[in-house]
Amino acid sequence: MAKAKFERTKPHVNIGTIGHVDHGKTTLTAAITTVLAKQGKAEARAYDQIDAAPEERERGITISTAHVEYETENRHYAHVDCPGHADYVKNMITGAAQMDGAILVVSAADGPMPQTREHILLSRQVGVPYIVVFLNKCDMVDDEELLELVEMEVRDLLSEYDFPGDEVPVIKGSALKALEGDAQWEEKIVELMNAVDEYIPTPQREVDKPFMMPVEDVFSITGRGTVATGRVERGTLKVGDPVEIIGLSDEPKSTTVTGVEMFRKLLDQAEAGDNIGALLRGVSRDEVERGQVLAKPGSITPHTKFKAQVYVLTKEEGGRHTPFFSNYRPQFYFRTTDVTGIITLPEGVEMVMPGDNVEMTVELIAPIAIEEGTKFSIREGGRTVGAGSVSEIIE
């Protein structure tokens, strides 16, 4: 069978189901595909197909994730669902599944549970910008007041983590009944997708963001100058554009791009995803190095101190065998280079065990171009022992 061509006519949005174990995330994912399949906008996927998620590796960490895709009238969606709680933690922290919004599934019969809270916190820490709530298993609750109560609890919990609890859409439904083809509950799935369509904005495309390229390599061309190579992470770059070289030094250096090459051919414009070489005016070979970034002036700044949400690998994942404490000094790998940093654990946290998910403060020995949401790995002697996401810049 020929591969279907990917039609890019509708805007693309990445979403996922989050919430406590057994509250119905995977059943809901199956129900969405099944209901939309009846409208010819998806391929119906059974619960078992989604639940048997393949393992993937992201930054040396093994994560099981199921990917489904479907369309609504307005959009094309890529949807992730994870079988286990640990998979969510790893997924969100490594950015393996970057979500533009999430559907928080809460069982109306049980109300918010510990992982409900943890997934909301993670969403806040790693920058999932919007949440829509699906109160599931409403067919099992006859008491209207109880439903109101659970809804209030969920809204309060969202507000506690700085989401707009009062504005978040809450849809009351039953994923299982919808999956079984019960029309009144199928309608709730349609209602949910309308809420997702309307409430979660179309994300800004990577190309439309300000230009940034992590420097991977640097070389000189006699008579022409210095070339920095790398993959454009976001934005576009044209010949004549001003850029700043940021990181590893106290002051960013300003320069102008006098040439852009890709596969040894000259380009008018490079964009997000392209591997390029950028010729930099008036920059000597030793003024730019791997680990720095080229960026649109003023769009990103170098920092040394930040808070981060971190997942620490287990021994089985190739991580540490022993806990670590405050003042631990591993390497922090940002984009293309390692920088030593000193870890301070939050008050009341004595030590961190392999397999833990923790917030920490990090102070790097050299400044790096970072912003909220920047992902990194923690390494020790060349092996990955943790993965993190910057949650707050301190200085």
Curated annotation (Swiss-Prot):
Q: Where does GTP bind?
A: 19-26, 81-85, 136-139
What positions does the domain tr-type G occupy? 10-204
Catalysed reactions listed for this entry = GTP + H2O = GDP + phosphate + H(+)
SUPFAM superfamilies registered for this protein in UniProt = EF-Tu/eEF-1alpha/eIF2-gamma C-terminal domain, P-loop containing nucleoside triphosphate hydrolases, Translation proteins
- Return the annotated region ranges for G2: 60-64
Q: What is this protein called?
A: Elongation factor Tu
Q: Where is this region: G5?
A: 174-176
Region listing for G1, in residue ranges? 19-26
Provide the residue span(s) of the region labelled G4: 136-139
Reported function: GTP hydrolase that promotes the GTP-dependent binding of aminoacyl-tRNA to the A-site of ribosomes during protein biosynthesis.
For the ligand (Mg(2+)), the binding residues are T26
A Pfam family (short name) is: GTP_EFTU_D2
PROSITE patterns named among the record's database cross-references = G_TR_1, G_TR_2
Q: Which GO terms describe its cellular component?
A: cytosol
InterPro entries, alphabetically? EF-Tu_GTP-bd, EF-Tu_GTPase, EFTu-like_2, EFTU_2, G_TR_CS, P-loop_NTPase, Small_GTP-bd, T_Tr_GTP-bd_dom
